[in-house]
C-alpha cells in the first residue's frame, strides 16, 4: 500500500486504530504512538492524506488526526461488470485500468459478481492496489454478513451458486418485483434438467451491453451460452443487488418454465410451451 498517498482510518479506539495500521504495514509503535495520539487528538474514521514523501513519526500521526483526504464519488450499479467500474475509476482518478484489472486478478479468484453495487466515496491519491483491496475487503464483509445472517455460517460453494443465479436474475428481471419469479423459472428448469436458454447469461464480460442475436446464440461456444449447455454459467455475469441475492435464495414457489417480455416492458410467465408461444404472439 506504500504507493498510496492516502490511508484509511477505521472506527474504534486509538488502540484499535493503531493495531489496524500496524496490520496494514505502517511502522507504528502500539504503546508509544497510542500515547502520542492521545496528546495530538484521536483520528476520525475515514480517509486521510499522508503524501508519498517520507514523514517523521510526529508528522504522520498529526496527519492521521487532522488531514482528511479529498473524496470523489463513484457509483457502481447492479447489472454492470467490474470492467466498467474500473474504466470509470481509472478516468476519475487518473489511474491505470490495466493495473486495476491486474491487481484484481492477483487478489481474488472471483471473475465477476463479487464487488458490491454501491456509491463509493474514494480518496484522491489512492493507488490501484490499495483501491482494489479496499473494494474487495468491503465486498468480503458484505457477502459474509448477508450469508451468515440467513444461514448462520458462510459456505463459499453455496454462496457462489447463489451469486451466479442472482446475476442471471439481475440481467433478466424487468424490476425487483419480478426477481423471485425469474428465480423460480431458473430453479424449475434446472430441476427438470432443461437448458436455461436465457439471453442474460450471454451478457458476460465484454458483451455486457451487446444485444443478443440468433447468430450469437448459434456461434458462442463459451460455457456462458445456456442455449447450448445445460446448467449454470461458471461465473456470475454481472454485479448483483441485495434484492437479486434474496430472490436467488428465496425463489417464489411456482410451476413457471417460461417468460417473455410483454408490451408493458415487464414479463409474462407461463407453465407450458404452448402458452409461452401464445404469449410471444401477444
Q: Which residue stretches match the model-derived regions?
A:
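Conserved catalytic or metal-liganding residues and their short signature motifs at active sites
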Residues: 1-197, 201-207, 212, 238-243, ...
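C-terminal amphipathic alpha-helical segment
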Residues: 213-249
Amino acid at each position: 500500500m506504500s504507493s498510496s498517498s492516502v490511508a484509511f482510518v477505521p472506527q474504534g479506539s486509538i488502540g484499535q486504530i493503531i493495531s489496524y495500521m500496524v496490520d496494514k504495514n505502517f511502522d507504528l509503535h502500539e504503546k508509544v504512538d497510542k500515547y502520542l495520539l492521545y496528546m495530538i487528538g484521536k483520528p476520525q474514521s475515514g480517509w486521510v492524506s499522508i503524501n508519498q514523501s517520507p514523514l517523521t513519526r510526529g508528522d504522520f500521526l498529526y496527519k492521521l488526526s487532522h488531514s482528511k483526504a479529498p473524496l470523489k464519488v463513484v457509483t457502481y450499479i447492479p447489472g454492470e461488470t467490474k470492467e466498467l467500474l474500473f474504466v470509470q475509476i481509472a478516468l476519475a482518478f487518473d489511474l491505470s485500468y490495466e493495473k486495476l484489472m491486474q491487481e484484481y486478478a492477483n487478489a481474488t479468484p472471483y471473475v465477476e459478481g463479487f464487488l458490491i453495487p454501491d456509491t463509493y466515496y474514494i480518496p484522491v491519491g489512492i493507488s490501484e492496489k490499495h483501491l482494489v483491496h479496499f473494494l474487495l475487503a468491503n465486498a468480503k464483509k458484505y457477502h459474509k454478513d448477508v450469508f451468515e445472517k440467513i444461514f448462520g455460517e458462510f459456505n463459499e460453494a453455496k454462496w457462489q451458486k447463489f451469486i451466479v443465479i442472482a446475476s442471471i436474475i439481475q440481467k433478466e428481471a424487468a424490476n425487483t418485483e419480478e426477481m423471485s419469479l425469474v428465480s423460480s423459472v431458473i430453479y424449475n428448469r434446472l430441476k427438470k434438467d432443461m437448458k436455461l436458454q436465457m439471453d442474460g447469461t450471454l451478457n458476460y464480460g465484454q458483451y455486457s451491453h451487446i444485444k443478443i442475436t440468433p447468430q450469437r446464440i448459434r456461434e458462442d461456444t463459451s460455457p456462458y451460452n445456456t442455449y447450448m449447455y445445460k446448467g449454470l454459467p461458471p461465473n456470475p455475469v454481472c454485479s448483483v443487488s441485495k434484492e437479486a441475492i434474496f430472490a436467488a435464495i428465496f425463489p417464489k414457489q411456482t410451476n413457471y418454465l417460461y417468460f417473455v417480455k410483454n408490451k408493458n416492458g415487464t414479463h409474462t410467465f407461463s407453465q407450458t410451451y404452448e402458452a409461452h408461444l401464445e404469449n410471444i404472439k401477444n
